[in-house]
């Protein structure tokens, strides 16, 4: 699996933990081991520019996903074909603000946003209540499973 992480933000992030989360999530979702994914951490100014350009929304946001090959989750018998999943852009400053509200660490929020971005790259959305239940349920399952796997490290 090719997972590139590029931190262009002023906030330090634990890249090895992000790498392990992405690997865990993609394995859980039966994505082909040759799939490619890039994650970029950016400051608020860069995120605001992307948010305006791609979503026509003012201000910075927490995470944006840019799917490439429109891959979907696979199954144990039929994994997702190899391909380019796309890019996830995370703003650690926005994540830090949200973490305070949520009552957990900035890194936990960054992991949540990364899992959220992966699900968007794989075609999940949360525009409708049933889609939101499915996506947020998978997101929760990934984060809980990952946390349990990290305890064993």
UniProtKB/Swiss-Prot annotation:
Cofactor field: Zn(2+)
EC number(s) per entry: 3.1.-.-
GO biological process, one term: rRNA processing
InterPro entries in alphabetical order: MetalPrtase_cat_dom_sf_prd, YbeY, YbeY_CS
PROSITE patterns given in the database record: UPF0054
Free-text remark on how the cofactor is bound: Binds 1 zinc ion.
Top-level lineage group: Bacteria
Annotated binding of Zn(2+), by residue: 116, 120, 126
Chief place of localization: cytoplasm
Function: Single strand-specific metallo-endoribonuclease involved in late-stage 70S ribosome quality control and in maturation of the 3' terminus of the 16S rRNA.
Protein name: Endoribonuclease YbeY
Species for this entry: Clavibacter michiganensis subsp. michiganensis (strain NCPPB 382)
């Amino acid at each position: 699996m090719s997972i590139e992480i590029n931190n262009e933000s002023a906030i330090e992030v634990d890249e090895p933990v992000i790498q392990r989360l992405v690997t865990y999530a993609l394995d859980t979702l039966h994505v082909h081991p040759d799939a490619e994914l890039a994650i970029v951490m950016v400051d608020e100014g860069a995120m605001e520019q992307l948010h305006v350009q791609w979503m026509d929304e003012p201000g910075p946001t927490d995470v944006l996903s840019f799917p490439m090959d429109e891959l979907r989750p696979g199954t144990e018998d039929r994994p997702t074909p190899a391909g380019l999943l796309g890019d996830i852009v995370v703003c650690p400053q926005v994540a830090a603000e949200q973490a305070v509200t949520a009552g957990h660490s900035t890194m936990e929020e960054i992991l949540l946003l990364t899992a959220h971005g992966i699900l968007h790259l794989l075609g999940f959305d949360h525009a409708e209540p049933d889609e939101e239940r499915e996506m947020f349920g998978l997101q929760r399952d990934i984060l809980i499973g990952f946390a349990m796997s990290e305890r064993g490290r």
